[in-house]
Structures are given as C-alpha cells and as structure tokens.
Regions:
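Bacterial N-terminal signal peptides
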Residues: 7-16
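Active-site acid/base region of carbohydrate-active enzymes
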Residues: 199, 296-305, 463, 472-506, ...
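Alpha-helical support elements that line or immediately flank enzyme active sites
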Residues: 190, 194, 204, 389-409, ...
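Bacterial N-terminal signal peptides that target proteins for export
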Residues: 1-7
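Non-catalytic C-terminal accessory modules of carbohydrate-active enzymes
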Residues: 271, 275-282, 293-328, 333, ...
Length: 927
C-alpha cells in the first residue's frame, strides 16, 4: 500500500539531535509492528517505536501520538482522529489507539513526538549533567482493510472441470480467469481485495500484482476462516480500457493426497480436501472527482483451464506446457472466444478475513557450486539444502522438448539422487517448450533461450537432476530462489568454535525454510505440516533469529481454529491432517507461543485473545486424563531419542524409553505455571490460584509415585525422566543435587557427553544443565562432532538440521534432512546463556546481560534486534582476562552480571555502548 511522503520539520531533520557528533534518532515507527505497507486487519491499532543513539542513558519522559485524516493535518499537529496529548510515560511499545472509531477502508496519517533525557558525555561515571530534547518522527501512514462481510459485493466464482484428477495424487490444471472493464475518468486511487483458493497470482493490464509475493493467500482451516489480501493498484490502472487476470491453483484448498471414499483425512494417503479452486475479487476505484466504482468477480468473467500450467501439486511438482501459452490474456483487447463463462461457486464455510501477516516472499538467491554430467542427465549442486525453487535458462530447446527437474536433499554413493526419504512425493517439475516468437523453427533454435521457474510449488533440496536439454548447461544458467514468510533477520551469533557456528548457520537455514505461512516440520516430502510439538520450545529460540511475531500470532489462530467443542486441540495446525491424540506436549505450543510473543515482543494480545481456548484445553486434559494427581496421556513419548542401533528410527531399548505419565505430568505442571502467569496478567485471581494449586497437588502426587528418595531417580532413570521435573521446579530442594547427579552420570558415562534425550528432553537440557552449574557439560554436548550430536550432522555434510540424530544411517521412511525439532533449546541457550541476553520485562524494557564464559570457548559475538532496539553482547576470554563489549538500547536498562575471580558482580546500566574488563583467572563457568 502507499506510504505518506517523508516529511520532516525543518529544525528536526531525520528526527535526530546532532551535537558535537552525537545523535539520537527515533526509528522504526510501526502500527501493529507493521510499516504501513499492508492494510491492517484491525480497527484498533497499536503504535510502537524505538531509538538509535550514540549518547548514553537515554530515557523517554513523554510521548504524544497524533493521528489525522490527512497528511497536512498531521504535519500541523491536528489530530482530528486522535491526539493522545502529551502523556508522561516511557512506554514505546504497542500503545493502543484511543481515538474516533475506525472502520473498513479508513486511512490515517500519524506521527509521534517524544521528550527524552540523555547523557552526552562518553564517560558513564561522569557527573556531566543530563540533557533533554524533543524528537518528532516522520509522518507515517496506515490503512484499514475490509473488516466485515457487508463490505463485500463480489461473489465466489470458479469452474469444475471433468478432467480434474482427484484420486490419490491429485492432478488439476490451473484455472485462468479474466475480465475486461472500462474506467471512465482519471484515477485517484484503487484497491484490490482478493482471495484465490488455494493459491493465486493476479495481473492488471499485463503486470503482475505484488510479483515478489508467492503462495497467496496465507494458509488456514478454510472451514473456519479464509484470508484475503489487499493491494494499492493505483499505478496499474488507466483511464479507458483495462483488464484483470488471475491464475488459480489448488494449493492446500485441494488435497495433495485424496480419496473421496475415505472419510478420515489422517495420514500420508489422505489430506483434508475443501473443494476445487475458486476466486473472489473486488477492485475499488476512486476517481479524481471522488466518485467510486467497483469491479467484482461474478458470472460475467471468463475462465479456462487450457493454459500452460497443467499440474501444480505441492508434493509432486509443476508441469508447464509452453505450447499452451495464452499470450497477452491479461491485457485489454484479448480474444477469449474459446473461454467459458465462470460459474458461481459455493463460498467456503469460513468467513473472509483480512490477512494479518505478510505473504511469503523471495528473500535470497543461491548460485550453484557444481554441475556435472551423469549419463544422459545433469546433476546440479546448490551447495546448501534450501527451500524454494529453481529458475532455469536453457538454450536451443525446440517446440515440444521436455526438460525435467527432480529434486533431492542428498545423493547416493553413485551420485544419483537419493529419493527414498521423500516417500510418495514426486518433487518433479517439467517444462515443455512452446513455439518461439524470437527465432524461426530452423537451425537458429540453438540460440533461443527458455527461462522458467514454477509458480505454485516449492521444493526442499540441495541437488537437482536435469534431463531433456539439447545443449550443455552452465552453472550460470540456474538460480536457486529462496523464500519464506516475509520477516527480518534479527539475530547474529558467532563464536570461536566452528561447530557452534556451523550448527547455528544450519539452524538459520532450516528454520526459515520451514516458514510457509505456518511453521512446518519439513519442506521436501509428502508432509509439510504445522506440527505443534516441533515448536513447543523451539519458538523461543527462533524468535531471536527472526522477527516472526506476525507469523506466530497467526499460527495461534490456526491452533484455536483446530479446537473441538470439548476442548481438544489438533497436533497439526492448520489441521490438514486429523491428528487429535490428546497429549500434553504437542498442543502445549498453544501456550508457549503466546508466552513467547509476550516475552519477546511485549504483546499481550495473543494471551488475551486465546486464553479462554487455552483454558478449555487444559480443563479437557484434566477432566479426561488427570487421575490421582497423575496425567497419564502422551502419544509420541520422548520422540526421536537416539536409538541403540544406527539403522533404527526409534529406540527399542526400554532403558532409553521414557513412559507417558513421566512426560505428560511434568508438562501439565509446566503449562499450569504459564496459565497462572497469564491469569495474573488478565487479573483473574481465581484462575491463578486454581492453576497454582494444580501444580502443588500434582507435584506432590508425582513425587510420591515416581521419585526414589534414596537414589534421586525418577521412574526408570532416563535423562528426560529426571530432567523434566528438575527443569519445571518439581524436585524437592533437598533432592535436587541427587537428581542432577543422575542426569550428569547418564549423560557423561552412558552417552559420553553427547545428546542423551529425544525431542522432549532436548527442549530443556542445555538451559537446565547450565542453571545447575554444569554449563561446561552443556558446552561439550553443543560442540561434539560424533554421534549423537548436532556437530555429527555438520561433520557428515548437513547444511540444515536432520530429523534424526542418525539421519545418515537410519531407515529413510522417516528421515528428513531439514527438520528443526531436534534443535530443542540450543538456539535459546546460544543467545541467552552464551551471549547472555535475556528479557527481565516483556519486550526487553529491562534486560538481563549475563554471559557464561565457559572454559574451551574463547569468544562469543551475539546481537539481537529487539523491539526495543539493538542489544549486543560480545566477549572474549583469554589468559584469565575477560573483555566484554555490550550495547543497551535507548530507553531501556540492564542488570549486568560481570564475571569476576570470585563469582560475579551485578550492576545496573543505562543505555549506550559499554566496555568491561575483568580478571577471572581460571574460573570459567558459573550459574
């Protein structure tokens, strides 16, 4: 959408103060943590900003938010929509709008004026006086999307074709829809509101709308809600004749695996099916004289499925037949006499909902590192297991030639593609060369270039097998286009240890590759689902790497949309598979993600919105499964525990298996503690007391049942059995040392200082060891490069994170090369314990800086771009001398734990850049 022109007061250029080389700038003004480029899905927006400064001890003392109906009024400080007046406050995150009621299509201009104090002197201990100044932001713009069903005048349209194949691996041709229309006058502005199910690409007068965005709109349970997008298309329209065109593909609206005779859509052979592709579109044009006109989807539109995209199944790939190219079908004057009239289509059950999160965008490009021939085919190596698609330029193809691209994460020993771990996914793209309008069909074909990439599918791959070429390809003929949900990279982490660095890099690639308008488990095989348990703890670490708040806030809606009337939640959200297993661990992400959004971004809204559904789920689990203080309900166990034999997927040895109640009962206490905190936040004292009483009663029953008070062992003494109650505060204080000793003994002596847990245990292992004084063991686990460890993956060529610790030897039936669930709390530990960056207050208004300089690690360079500003922590330790540079954002403070020879010293620091040197001798790890 459009933004207001950048306007500054003459005496406040860049909203900064500048004196003797010092400056203080108000930056990142956002509404709902958005920059105004996307219409808002709410009429109750919240305003945020932060600062950049090279002065110290910056404190905001007041703010004034002005919201106006025009840019001129905002410039003149006339807040005809809302003027907060000068408000004494240091608040700068998510301040709610409290002005005149806003509604669909409303546009507003806003700015903020703040007063701040700061200390200009570079010496933090100096007595130099505190100065104050006023800072004014640039004028910003926001717009409200369509919020109600009565805003829509369009109808759903489509067409059911007899040649659609809806058996098992569904095959349908893309739908092409078009409409020509006349605009009678010059245009002031125009908005396009559109939803195409399952996926769409839209064009106006031959130009694609938002070409950088793909896989639109965001995924959802279409029985609960259907997202639509909104665009400013003013520049794409003209007075006179115009044309609009839309391509539709099945996406997730049409099941990738389907059998109409099966009622249960659970598993690899049957995903959820909602129907054939359909479109709703509303183009609203405002003329220069202020009058308006709407162009809407209805039965006057033309449609065909005889275009070049013949199939587009997310699991199996896309086939593009250039011989069926439709020419300039998105421009006015096109002859469409062979097309059909579109039919009215049944609306999806879910209401149209303004999409709250950005779409997926291309955000990186890779060049191949190798290209070699194998028989009659070519093998391309991208050098990185990536998620996206391949763009190809081929020379000399003739009409009817077929180029086939197959994708894989790894190679067999003979350099052929290893495809066994893809299950039924065909992951094959095909392009058939059409007639050329550049050269005649003679010898000059060899000079013709065919450039192509798919539109509606993606792949998880490092290697590509290419067949059907007539000329020898070159590496520069190919590009890997990397895409994921649009978001900023917010974390930076580097150490003196190559394994830690490589694993962090692999995590970065794996996490972003599994953002597909939901956090997925994997990007390559016939699954690609939003498994909740993969993110129960992982979401906390991911949110250091990426500004993913809008993706995760949207995913919480997906989770609540999966809820049954009895309170049960699906393990997969959106619930394209029917996975209602009633266990505490996987759906627990519903609660932990909301906690993360509050902690990391200062956002209470997710807790307020979803608390009733969270409570229904907790009550459902208590009502059906909590007996005598024990909740004996778990489906997956300590998933992917390192097995005793390298060819196994799951451990068979009873000594490695943690029983259900020993997992689910501690998790019930853990989540009850989160719920009690939420109840405190929401001023629900009865709920808070209830959940805290649950913890007390269940903890007592659990310890009586499973804790051996002589040995300090829980149940069968697996690391996870002992770890969970210790991590969740359930172990009696006098028993903590014994329980910890059992964890250490198992990890060091039976596992040789390697990973000793599965998915559930690894979510708590690194932090718990460190909190109890054995961070040295955590570091050993993190830096090992032999099995089982993250470093073992690196040493065996992984460039992402495997699904299994033994991913290079295990049965390929469940052996993804790009899963993030095994990361557990590693990334969280990297930033919060090695880097030492933690939030003491939501949104990092107060910060804890507490790095852990373990022996064997010489340096850590860590940074996090929080919503309150940039936090940096970079330290080195050599010959007993600890040197530390850290940055505290403006308008925040930090409790700083300084390592000393005898332990630590704690000081409170204001904002700015600081340097500390401390002699710590040989003492190198601490709590």
């Amino acid at each position: 959408m459009r933004r207001a022109p950048i306007v500054y007061l003459i005496f406040m250029v860049l909203a900064a103060i500048t004196a003797q080389g010092q400056h203080l700038v108000l930056v990142h003004p956002t509404v709902e943590y958005q920059d105004g480029s996307q219409p808002l899905a709410t009429a109750e927006p919240r305003f945020s900003w932060n600062y950049q400064a090279d002065v110290r001890d910056v404190r905001q003392t007041s703010y004034r938010i002005i919201v106006a109906s025009t840019e001129e009024k905002a410039r003149d400080n006339v807040g005809d929509l809302w003027d907060s007046q000068t408000t004494p406050s240091d608040r700068m995150l998510l301040i709610p709008y409290q002005g005149k009621a806003l509604g669909s299509r409303d546009q507003a201009y806003w700015k903020v004026i703040t007063t701040v104090t700061y200390r200009p002197d570079a010496d933090v201990t100096s007595a130099t006086g505190v100065l104050d100044t006023t800072i004014e932001s640039k004028i910003n713009y926001f717009e409200i999307s369509l919020l109600g069903s009565d805003d829509w005048y369009a109808q759903w349209i489509g067409f059911n074709y007899d040649d659609d194949s809806l058996v098992q691996k569904t095959r349908i041709a893309a739908r092409y829809l078009r409409k020509e229309f006349l605009l009678r006058d010059e245009i002031r502005e125009a908005r396009l509101y559109i939803s195409g199910l399952g996926q769409y690409s839209a064009f106006l007068n031959g130009t694609e709308v938002a070409p950088q965005e793909i896989f639109k709109p965001a995924l959802s349970d279409y029985h609960k809600r259907v997202y639509f997008n909104a665009y400013d298309v003013t520049r794409l329209l003209q007075k006179g004749d115009n044309a609009i065109g839309v391509i539709l593909a099945g996406g997730r609206f049409m099941a990738m695996r389907y059998n109409a005779s099966e009622g249960d859509w659970c598993g690899l052979n049957h995903t959820r099916h909602f129907g054939a592709p359909r479109l709703i579109l509303q183009l609203e044009v405002t003329y220069q004289d202020g009058t308006t006109e709407r162009i809407v989807s209805n039965e006057s539109w033309q449609i065909t499925n005889l275009g070049p995209i013949r199939t587009a199944n997310e699991f199996d790939g896309e086939t593009y037949d250039g011989r069926m190219d439709l020419g300039d079908w998105t421009t006015a004057g096109y002859t469409d006499y062979r097309w059909q009239r579109a039919s009215s289509a049944y609306p999806p059950e879910g209401p149209l909902t303004a999409q709250p999160n950005p779409n997926i965008c291309i955000q990186d490009t890779l060049k191949p590192i190798a290209l070699f021939r194998k028989g009659d085919r070519w093998i391309l190596d991208m050098g990185q297991n990536m998620v996206g698609y391949l763009e190809m330029s081929a020379l000399g193809l003739r009409e009817g030639d077929t180029v086939t691209l197959r994708f894989a994460e790894t190679l067999n020993p003979d350099s052929s593609l290893f495809l066994d771990n893809l299950r039924s996914a065909e992951v094959t793209d095909r392009i058939i060369r059409g007639a050329t309008n550049v050269h005649s069909k003679t010898e000059r074909y060899k000079d013709a270039v065919t450039t192509w990439h798919p539109t509606f599918v993606y792949h998880g791959f490092r290697y590509v097998e290419i067949t059907g070429l007539r000329t020898e390809p070159k590496p520069h003929h190919f590009r890997g286009l990397v895409f994921y949900d649009q978001m900023a990279t917010t974390g930076r982490f580097e150490t003196s240890d190559e394994i830690l660095n490589a694993v962090h890099r692999n995590a970065y690639w794996g996490i972003r590759g599994n953002y597909r308008s939901m956090p997925t488990d994997c990007p390559q095989r016939d699954e690609r689902m939003g498994w909740t348990g993969d993110r129960t703890t992982g979401n906390y670490g991911e949110s250091y790497l990426f500004g993913n708040q809008r993706l995760y806030a949207k995913w919480l809606t997906d989770i609540e949309d999966s809820q049954w009337a009895n309170g049960a939640l699906s393990d997969v959200c959106p619930n394209y598979w029917r996975r209602y297993t009633d266990n505490m661990t996987w759906p627990g992400a519903f609660i932990t993600v909301a906690d993360m959004l509050h902690t990391r971004y200062g956002d209470e809204q997710a807790i307020r919105a979803h608390y009733p559904a969270m409570k229904r789920w907790m009550m459902h689990m208590k009502r059906h499964y909590l007996v005598d203080g024990i909740l004996n309900r778990d489906c997956y166990g300590d998933w992917c525990m390192p097995p005793e034999s390298l060819e196994l997927v799951h451990a068979q040895d009873p000594a490695r298996i943690t029983r259900a109640a020993v997992i689910s009962t501690p998790f019930y206490c853990y989540l009850s503690d989160k719920m009690a905190q939420f109840a405190d936040l929401l001023s629900l004292p009865d709920d808070a007391a209830f959940f805290r009483n649950e913890i007390q009663v269940v903890t007592q029953a659990y310890n009586e049942r499973y804790l051996d008070k002589k040995t300090g062992r829980y149940d069968n003494n697996t690391v996870t059995a002992n770890l969970l109650p210790l991590a969740f505060g359930m172990v009696p204080k006098k028993m903590e040392e014994k329980v910890l000793a059992n964890i250490i003994d198992k990890t060091e002596n039976e596992f040789g200082g390697h990973v000793s847990t599965g998915v559930i245990g690894i979510q708590q292992l690194m932090r718990t060891l460190t909190e109890h004084g054995r961070g040295d063991l955590a570091l050993k686990i993190a830096t090992n490069d032999t099995y089982p460890s993250w470093g073992y993956m690196v040493r065996n060529g992984a460039t992402t994170i495997w699904e299994l610790w033994n991913g290079n030897t295990a049965d390929p039936s469940m052996n993804s090369g790009n899963h993030v669930m095994l990361l557990g709390d590693l990334i969280l530990w990297d930033y919060e314990y090695l880097g030492g960056i933690r939030a003491l207050e939501p949104g990092y208004r107060r910060i804890l800086l507490k790095p852990h300089p373990f022996a064997g690690l010489e340096s850590v360079n860590c940074a996090y771009e929080s919503v309150s500003g940039l936090i940096e922590s970079s330290w080195s330790c050599k010959d007993g001398l600890f040197e530390w540079d850290f940055t505290i954002p403006a308008n925040t403070t930090a409790d700083v734990w300084i390592p000393t020879a005898n332990g630590h010293e704690v000081k409170t620091y204001g904002s700015g850049q600081h340097h500390i040197t401390s002699k710590i001798g040989t003492w190198r790890f601490w709590k």
